[in-house]
Design a protein with these regions (language model features):
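Structural marker of alpha-solenoid helical repeat scaffolds
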Residues: 55-56, 89-90, 123, 157, ...
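Helix-start (N-cap) detector for alpha-helical repeat units in TPR-like alpha-solenoids
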Residues: 27, 60-61, 94-95, 128-129, ...
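Canonical tetratricopeptide repeat
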Residues: 65-66, 99, 133, 167, ...
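Terminal, low-structured helical/coil segments at or just beyond the last alpha-helical repeat
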Residues: 1-13, 250-253, 258-296
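Canonical positions in the second alpha-helix
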Residues: 52-53, 85-86, 119-120, 153-154, ...
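Alpha-helical segment of the N-proximal tetratricopeptide repeat
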Residues: 19-61, 65-72, 95, 99-106, ...
Length: 296
């Protein structure tokens, strides 16, 4: 390359120029290999490659990729630091603030979430996604009233906001407003088909209303769609126990424990058919310990 330059440009490439050109090539190779590793799911290797690339040259795109790789390997604080540097370079980028909020949520740093949402709202005050994120921060701090208010704003901005309706329905139910929660559940049921989270919400609402058989029907739909839904087995078992179906409750508890062995801690003593004279009593004790619906 230096010889050709001397022919056509009349000068020889200096050592500094050669070094700079080589570093540029090496940077490009590290960046390309890092992206390839990230796409192949080799996130730890991608982190190493992107880090080496940034040691050679500061590059916003590489920092973006590095933040993604760090999230994949659960190095969340470091991912947040990379996103901070990106946001400093692009302070009006709402999407970056949203990504920072997502990381703060994973870190369970709800105060930071609120701060980021407020910053983003100063830029885009009518963004319903920001309302939902703010609501999640409120929920994390136990402020359900403001969470519902933010979710209602999000729904007012976009009526078909299913995520906001589902979350609002869940929070309303937790607050004891079964009627309002039921309205959200019915809207979701009318506008979606077979969504597990919606079916679970509907089941819990029917149980709160005392409609045990209807609740079981919803739980049946959940486990039919997803035979690995541990919470559905656990909650359906509690309902079955409440209506006197100890055999069904026992079967559900067994399924729950198979899917969630840690749930064994909720059971007093060893839970197995062998060596147990009163398996029904063990089922009742298990549900009293876990108490999903406050059964006495």
């Amino acid at each position: 390359m230096g010889f050709l330059k001397s022919l056509f440009n009349g000068k020889v490439e200096t050592p500094e120029e050669k070094k700079k050109e080589e570093e540029s090539r090496n940077f490009d190779v590290l960046k390309y290999d890092g992206v390839k590793a990230l796409r192949l799911g080799e996130s730890a290797h991608a982190v190493e490659l992107f880090t080496r690339a940034l040691e050679m040259q500061d590059d916003l795109e590489v920092r973006d990729y590095l933040s993604q790789a760090l999230i994949h390997v659960n190095r969340l604080d470091e991912a947040y630091e990379q996103l901070q540097q990106l946001a400093a370079a692009e302070p009006e980028n709402v999407q970056l603030l949203v990504r920072m909020t997502d990381v703060a949520y994973m870190l369970e740093d709800y105060d930071r979430m609120e701060e980021l949402c407020e910053r983003a709202m100063l830029i885009d005050k009518d963004n319903p996604m920001l309302m939902v994120l703010y609501a999640r921060a409120c929920i994390g701090r136990g402020d359900l009233v403001n969470a519902v208010a933010m979710l209602t704003r999000a729904i007012t901005m976009r009526e078909d906001n299913g995520d906001a309706r589902l979350l609002r329905g869940e929070m309303l139910l937790e607050m004891g407003d079964v009627e309002s929660a039921d309205e959200d559940a019915k809207w979701l049921d009318d506008h979606s088909s077979g969504v597990e989270e919606v079916l679970m919400l509907s089941a819990r609402i029917e149980e709160r209303k005392g409609n045990h058989e209807k609740a079981v029907e919803y739980y049946d739909q959940v486990v039919k769609a997803n035979p690995f839904h541990a919470a559905a087995f656990k909650e359906r078992g509690a309902v079955r126990l409440a209506i006197g179906d100890k055999e069904g409750a026992e079967a559900d508890m067994r399924s729950y424990l198979e899917l969630n062995p840690e749930g064994m801690d909720e059971v007093t003593g060893e839970y197995s058919a062998e060596g147990k004279e009163d398996i029904g009593r063990q089922v009742e004790q298990a549900y009293r310990n876990s108490n999903p619906f406050g059964l006495g």
